[in-house]
């Protein structure tokens, strides 16, 4: 048994109790703050911002838990019921984070009074570049690390991140994991864009237009959780909560870096498999890029 788990749980709930005492005049049944993200799209940045609300309301001071649709080390895809059990395990005033598919059952839960949900995503071209660096250099336990490390160069790895990887099979012929092309990887998240209860955030807006984007995040929160605290004070808390040095997977936080790494071939294959995705997400108006 991992002794760290019960210790972390005890610390978490103790801090939540202290937060409740600190903000005793505010309701105890405030909705859960849920940050949904596409992988490599600013997960920890959004986590930090949402935790900034703990300075002005009785929210937890750390993320309750993180859920991902795939197990990082094995690459095994979790069954839909696991996501629902995780969502049901969350309690009022929690702050939680997830790479969560927009399946109908999950959407029904998240788009309910129980949650204040946010969805952050990033230019998929930057995502595939970030993915190469992360898998190759930052996470040796990742299911794809050994394979990426075996490839001859960055260009080849980037090609795999765009096109995906054929499923290696077990002795029984069953695929061990799935890693389709970038458009297919994003497809299960697309329905979050259609939910008015979910605030969608371009990662780039938090880098290039942070003040306006933090105001949008705050407005979405205040629509459900009215606070007596001055708006300027809340915004200062959200801004102060951002600390890239505390992100375990932070690399550069820059936008448009794909332009430094994409060759003509990368552009061609990306347009073939994910050109429409860029249009849907608002990153391009056509394929002439």
Where are these regions (language model features)?
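PAPS-dependent sulfotransferase catalytic domain
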Residues: 2-154, 164-201, 265-268, 272-276, ...
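Short coil/turn segments at secondary-structure boundaries
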Residues: 250-254, 284-289
């Amino acid at each position: 048994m991992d002794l760290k788990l019960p210790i972390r749980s005890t610390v978490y709930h103790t801090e939540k109790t202290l937060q409740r005492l600190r903000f005793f005049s505010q309701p105890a049944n405030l909705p859960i703050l849920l940050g949904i993200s596409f992988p490599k799209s600013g997960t920890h940045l959004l986590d930090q911002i949402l935790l900034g609300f703990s300075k002005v309301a009785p929210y937890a001071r750390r993320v309750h838990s993180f859920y991902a649709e795939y197990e990082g080390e094995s690459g095994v895809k979790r069954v839909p019921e696991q996501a629902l059990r995780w969502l049901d395990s969350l309690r009022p005033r929690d702050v939680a984070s997830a790479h969560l598919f927009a399946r109908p059952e999950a959407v029904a839960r998240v788009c309910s009074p129980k949650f204040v949900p946010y969805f952050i995503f990033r230019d998929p071209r930057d995502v595939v570049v970030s993915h190469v660096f992360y898998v190759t250099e930052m996470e040796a336990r990742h299911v794809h690390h050994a394979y990426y490390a075996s490839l001859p160069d960055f260009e080849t790895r980037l090609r795999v991140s765009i096109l995906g990887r054929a499923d290696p099979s077990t002795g029984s012929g069953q695929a061990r994991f799935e890693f389709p092309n970038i458009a297919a990887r994003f497809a299960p998240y697309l329905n979050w864009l259609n939910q008015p209860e979910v605030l969608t955030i371009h990662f780039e807006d938090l880098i290039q237009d942070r003040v306006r984007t933090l105001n949008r995040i705050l407005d979405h929160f205040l629509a459900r959780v009215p606070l007596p605290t001055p708006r300027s004070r809340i915004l200062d808390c959200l801004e102060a909560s951002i600390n890239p040095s505390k992100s375990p997977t932070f690399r550069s936080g820059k936008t448009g870096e794909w332009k430094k790494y994409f060759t003509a071939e990368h552009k061609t294959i990306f347009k073939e498999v994910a050109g429409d995705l860029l249009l849907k997400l608002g990153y391009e108006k056509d394929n002439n890029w």
